[in-house]
């Protein structure tokens, strides 16, 4: 089954017929008067006439509807798919054109970039890090806040100049928008920026070779339909940084939480999990490549539930944290996150495991027990609070009160002594009063996070807040409150990080410090940056051998100073996770 058949099947289930018509027209009708010379020398008119001829004899609209109504198996890999009837196999090939990828936003977008590149690489495209030599520029975008989108609009204005200066002797420069912004602003992008050739939503990356082939005929092309089952489970992401020591492994996509402020369910679709077997296979391959850290990734990572294996389809139920509720009917059965975390941690004892981003409602004791017991699961938890006011949390539809959140924090710290905590906060949400703000300030002081991500509220269309609430906190008040939260966070983080001074910590070396070529930089268990001098030290596995630590090495570092974001220390020796876990680090 080729990509369009899957696309229309998903559309039949999730959107009105008019949207389907729009995408079909957007994909196949000419919207761009720019000529597109064929690399073999055919005229623009000849290419378009040939394309139109084959399109006329290709599938009809009714053909797509019939195909969409018949359940079909997804192919095991994108290579086995037949080309659409209106395109030849050769037209789906990249012909060694060079692709430049720019990534904005969250770590999911970093992983999406690796998935998109894996697909394009198999179609014959080449990767370039030089913007000037690119034939195709793809921006992997974010829509979580207005500022993120404005960054992309500004970037498009810069690329418009580059496209206009393109020498006629070269193939036309193609520009595409991928990811959440393509999903949210599809119509506006195509109408406002005629220089954008291609749009692909988060669930349409398999379709990139076809979309680029359509673009080569001189048209704009778009596929922004969300899927109910796409997880890219069969695609091995290509690491964009060959020297990296860590990698992100996407275990699920989409989100069902429907928090009132959040655009994610509308840009990334419903929650669906990858089969456990495919995740374990990817982690094994990363281990074989020598990577030393894997972060399991998802919008709501700890609500993972794999129902792909029949024998687990009717067992188990939702196990929410005490005092927490959901905005949706929890799925039943399947292999849960605790099972996945257990299996991943067994693959390579020398590979550190992290996960993000979780929801506080999904922290059963079996997950906490695994974190406590397994030496290679980092003792660090991201616990997004968003606000310290129960009234604001209710308006946000977070499913918990301040009291329930604080109780969970205490429970986690009892279960995992010394655990590092990080969190997200939004200030200036609809209806937030000064008292609500002060309650958030007090929560920051009470919990004392190691790391924090704090933002002023930015209303997003389609969200529940957009339709039912009023963005009534003035911008200057939002910014003032944000500055206050940042100040308090730094004060408290400095205090909690100062307790590490005098301790010896296991650090995974990432490379040289950005500020000094004589210092190395790495991260500890709590995911804090640790800076230490590049010096010869003993290798604990080979006494007497003097070595210099390299990226991917584990070293013991004695902490001598701390700030709100960074620890500094002296390197003691090179070690392994196993050896360090057998010794008490103090």
UniProtKB/Swiss-Prot annotation:
Residues 1-30 form a transit peptide. GO terms for cellular component: cytosol; mitochondrial inner membrane; mitochondrial matrix; mitochondrion; nucleoplasm. It catalyses: N(6)-dimethylallyladenosine(37) in tRNA + (sulfur carrier)-SH + AH2 + 2 S-adenosyl-L-methionine = 2-methylsulfanyl-N(6)-dimethylallyladenosine(37) in tRNA + (sulfur carrier)-H + 5'-deoxyadenosine + L-methionine + A + S-adenosyl-L-homocysteine + 2 H(+). InterPro entries: Elp3/MiaA/NifB-like_rSAM, Methylthiotransferase, Methylthiotransferase_CS, Methylthiotransferase_N, Methylthiotransferase_N_sf, MiaB_methiolase, rSAM, rSAM_horseshoe. Transmembrane segments: none annotated. Residues 68-90 are annotated as: Disordered. Its cofactor is [4Fe-4S] cluster. It comes from the Eukaryota. Interacts with CDK5R1 (p35 form). CDK5RAP1, CDK5RAP2 and CDK5RAP3 show competitive binding to CDK5R1. Forms a complex with CDK5R1 and CDK5. This is Mitochondrial tRNA methylthiotransferase CDK5RAP1. It comes from Rattus norvegicus (Rat). The gene is Cdk5rap1.
